[in-house]
Amino acid sequence: MAYLKIVLVALMLVLAVSAMRRPDQQDQDISVAKRVACKCDDDGPDIRSATLTGTVDLGSCDEGWEKCASYYTVIADCCRRPRS
């Protein structure tokens, strides 16, 4: 019975916090592009001294971008714009 009370209180807190968000904040969160840098194969052997020229894209690379890392992940790829 104590676990049920804890779960109910936690759910009520989550509901209260989510209700306090302004509606315009939700629209802004969706439109913001979040990018994370990643290491391409030709950036160098050491991750500490490498310049991270790639960008993590969920799924596969966007149109006009190329995959720049040889390792394979199901969730995301390390991509960059093609060099001229």
From Swiss-Prot:
<dbReference type="GO" id="GO:0042151">
    <property type="term" value="C:nematocyst"/>
</dbReference>
<feature type="disulfide bond">
    <location>
        <begin position="38"/>
        <end position="78"/>
    </location>
</feature>
<keyword id="KW-0738">Voltage-gated sodium channel impairing toxin</keyword>
<feature type="signal peptide">
    <location>
        <begin position="1"/>
        <end position="19"/>
    </location>
</feature>
<keyword id="KW-0800">Toxin</keyword>
<feature type="disulfide bond">
    <location>
        <begin position="61"/>
        <end position="79"/>
    </location>
</feature>
<feature type="propeptide">
    <location>
        <begin position="20"/>
        <end position="33"/>
    </location>
</feature>
<dbReference type="GO" id="GO:0005576">
    <property type="term" value="C:extracellular region"/>
</dbReference>
<keyword id="KW-0165">Cleavage on pair of basic residues</keyword>
<dbReference type="Pfam" id="PF00706">
    <property type="entry name" value="Toxin_4"/>
</dbReference>
<feature type="disulfide bond">
    <location>
        <begin position="40"/>
        <end position="68"/>
    </location>
</feature>
<keyword id="KW-0528">Neurotoxin</keyword>
<protein>
    <recommendedName>
        <fullName>Delta-thalatoxin-Tas1a</fullName>
    </recommendedName>
</protein>
<comment type="similarity">
    <text>Belongs to the sea anemone sodium channel inhibitory toxin family. Type II subfamily.</text>
</comment>
<keyword id="KW-0964">Secreted</keyword>
<keyword id="KW-0166">Nematocyst</keyword>
<dbReference type="InterPro" id="IPR023355">
    <property type="entry name" value="Myo_ane_neurotoxin_sf"/>
</dbReference>
<dbReference type="GO" id="GO:0017080">
    <property type="term" value="F:sodium channel regulator activity"/>
</dbReference>
<comment type="function">
    <text>Binds specifically to the voltage-gated sodium channel (Nav) and delays its inactivation.</text>
</comment>
<keyword id="KW-0732">Signal</keyword>
<keyword id="KW-0872">Ion channel impairing toxin</keyword>
<dbReference type="GO" id="GO:0090729">
    <property type="term" value="F:toxin activity"/>
</dbReference>
<keyword id="KW-1015">Disulfide bond</keyword>
